[in-house]
Design a protein with these regions (language model features):
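N-terminal organellar transit peptides
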Residues: 1-104, 108-114, 119-134, 138-236
Length: 236
C-alpha cells in the first residue's frame, strides 16, 4: 500500500514540476499553456519576477503539435510583454500549428503580448482585461544614428505585419494606436480594454474560460471532419 502511495506522490510531484517549468497542463485532449509575467528570452530576468521562458515553451509547442493524444491548445495570457524576438518567435510557432488553438486574455496582454494574443486561430478577451500597444523599446545604450532608428522601424514593422495578418485590425489603425500621445504619461502608445480590443478587430470576441473551451471543442470536432485545422479552416 505504501508503494502505491509513493508512486502516486511521485506522479503528482512530476506533474507539479512540469507545470512549474512549462506553464502548461494537459487535461484529456486539450493542453493549456499559460503565458504569464514577462517573456524571458536571450537574457535571464531577476529571480523575483514571474516569467515565461522561451526555452520551455518552444519544445513544448513542438511536442504538442506532434502528439496524437492532444487535439487542441488553450493559451491563457496575463503578460507584461518582454523579449521582442522571443515573444514574436513563440507567436509565430503557435500561428503555424496544425492543431486548433484558442487564446484567452486575462488581466493583460501588453506589448509583445499583443502578437501572442492574436496568434491563435480564435482569440477571446475578458471585459476587464487591458492591452498596451506601443512602439518597440530597447534597454541599455544605443547609438544615436539614423541606422538605429531604421532598425527599430524594421523590427516594429515585423510586429505590425504579424498582428494585422492574424487579426482584423488595419495597419493604419494599429500604427495610430502605437503613436498615440495623450493616453500614457511621458510615453507614446494606447491602453485599450476588452470591449475596445474587439471593436477594433484586434481580438475576435469577448468571453471567458467557458467560451474559450466551447469554441476549442467546436474547432476540434471540425478539424476531425476536415483532417486538420491549419490556416483558416477552423476560423469563423
Amino acid at each position: 500500500m505504501s508503494n502505491e502511495n509513493e508512486k502516486q506522490q511521485d506522479v503528482l510531484t512530476d506533474e507539479l514540476e512540469y507545470i512549474e517549468k512549462s506553464g502548461g497542463i494537459k487535461s484529456d485532449n486539450i493542453h493549456c499553456i499559460s503565458i504569464i509575467g514577462q517573456i524571458e528570452g536571450h537574457y535571464i530576468l531577476p529571480s523575483e519576477q514571474k516569467t515565461t521562458k522561451y526555452e520551455h515553451i518552444v519544445p513544448l509547442l513542438f511536442a504538442i503539435d506532434r502528439s496524437d493524444e492532444i487535439e487542441g491548445v488553450l493559451i491563457i495570457l496575463n503578460t507584461l510583454g518582454g523579449d521582442v524576438e522571443s515573444g514574436l518567435a513563440i507567436a509565430e510557432l503557435i500561428a503555424s500549428m496544425k492543431k486548433p488553438t484558442v487564446s484567452l486574455v486575462l488581466g493583460g496582454g501588453h506589448s509583445i503580448g499583443v502578437p501572442l494574443a492574436v496568434c491563435a486561430k480564435k482569440s477571446f478577451i475578458v471585459q476587464s482585461a487591458t492591452m498596451t500597444i506601443h512602439p518597440v523599446r530597447v534597454s541599455g545604450t544605443i547609438i544615436g544614428t539614423p541606422q538605429t532608428y531604421f532598425y527599430f522601424e524594421k523590427m516594429q514593422n515585423r510586429i505590425i505585419k504579424f498582428v494585422c495578418d492574424n487579426s482584423k485590425i488595419s495597419k493604419e489603425k494599429l500604427k495610430a494606436l502605437m503613436l498615440e500621445t495623450d493616453q500614457i504619461a511621458t510615453d507614446t502608445g494606447s491602453v485599450i480594454d476588452g470591449n475596445e480590443a474587439v471593436e477594433l478587430g484586434l481580438i475576435d470576441e469577448i468571453g471567458g474560460l467557458d467560451d474559450a473551451l466551447n469554441e476549442l471543442e467546436r474547432m476540434i470536432k471540425e478539424s476531425k471532419n476536415h483532417g486538420d485545422c491549419h490556416g483558416d479552416s477552423c476560423k469563423i
